[in-house]
Amino acid sequence: MKLVLGALQWTAFIIAAAIVVPVAVAQSFHLDHSDSARLIQSTFFVLGIAAVIQCLKGHRLPINESPAGLWWGVYTIYAGLTGTVFATYGDTLRGLQGALLVSAVCFFLLSVFKVIDRLAKLFTPVVTGVYLLLLVMQLSQPIIKGILGIGYRQDGVDGLVFGLALVVIAAAFIMTNSNIMFFKQYSILLALFGGWVLFAAAGAAKPIEMPDRLFQLPSLFPFGTPLFNSGLIITSIFITILLIVNMLASMKVVDIAMKKFSKQPDGKHHERHAGFAASFSHLLSGLTGAIAPVPISGAAGFIETTKMPSKKPFMLGSILVIVISVIPFFMNTFASLPSPVGFAVNFVVFSAMGGLAFAEFDSYEKEESKRVRSIIGISLLTGVGIMFVPETALKGLHPVFISLLSNGLVLGTLAAIAADQFQLWRRRKSDNLVSTENKH
């Protein structure tokens, strides 16, 4: 029973965390109901398979997959460029399928030549801590907007939705801090489904759309055979490198979260295996027209909140996602979960991640505090600052630059890596000079 409830909790969390992206992309490309359903289905089918493969043969951690925010940005950018780069929305989607296949090859090559292993060494505690803080800051805007009901039933703040979301948040926090283990471990599941019932009772839930078939597998190249555009190829190579940075950060923070509980990681480094698994998930995404997934750091918050680091419920939950994705009625049912409920639960989950960031900073000796603080200042100023740059200011730039300059999380993390490595290089150089002088 514990395994089943844990699996259902993971399933609900995975779907709630991922449903927004394919729906938003479908709207950007003005897809009809049939094509929208196909995009949503293939995306969940792939992310479920990706999570299982990663947990078994990749990074070997309970990290749920979600459509990559970087790819979401690329899809949105190229939807706006339709008519300029590609003639139609269909051609643009075919070009994006080609970009995912190129990315799959890049993941494979970077894993074969052990580039991923070298990148993993750059994630020192200060870089990981900065990444966590920036993650919470970047997600704070959509989470708060979702809780306020903006864009759910109306464009402005929805008082009813906001009130109901506050009830869900309060209930989730109470259960998370409860002395009753059942409520503590299943707080996310209870909050999601309890919130759903609450919204339905208040008339704020959306109806479930009835499908026209009982079973449906994703189709091969649903938007047509892939197109390979030189600009998209360059973009996909750059995006792959950024996704590796994102993936390594997620592995690091979940590893930290698991060390706080009984389930200890095996101590081995699986970065290359994770890269090969990501290559497969991008290949599958390109073949089925899905939005490629990436391991997300929210899993650390989930583990912190539920105190459940076991892989078995996660594996079963991911398998349930795969099953749900091929049964349209189940997919439509879960897709009708009120988005403010998901945002309310994510508020609780991600609030736990700020503490993980400061724990990373505290792991340094007192003598390092000045260096660490300077890195934090540089990276936060860079990452948070870029979050306030309006998207309209980036129009006309190459999609590669737009992808970087519109993502404060990635840019701030890269700034932290650069500042950290530069200061470590200066210290090594200084130590070598002192050592040479002492010899003479």
Curated annotation (Swiss-Prot):
One annotated Gene Ontology cellular component of this protein: plasma membrane
Transmembrane stretches, start-end: 3-23, 39-59, 67-87, 96-116, 130-150, 156-176, 188-208, 231-251, 283-303, 314-334, 341-361, 374-394, 399-419
NCBIfam families: NCS2_1
The protein's name in its UniProt record: Putative purine permease YwdJ
Stated induction or repression of this protein's expression: Negatively regulated by TnrA under nitrogen-limited conditions.
GO molecular function: xanthine transmembrane transporter activity
UniProt record similarity statement: Belongs to the nucleobase:cation symporter-2 (NCS2) (TC 2.A.40) family.
Phosphoprotein in keyword set: no
Native source species: Bacillus subtilis (strain 168)
InterPro entries: NCS2, Xan_ur_permease
Cellular localization per UniProt: Cell membrane
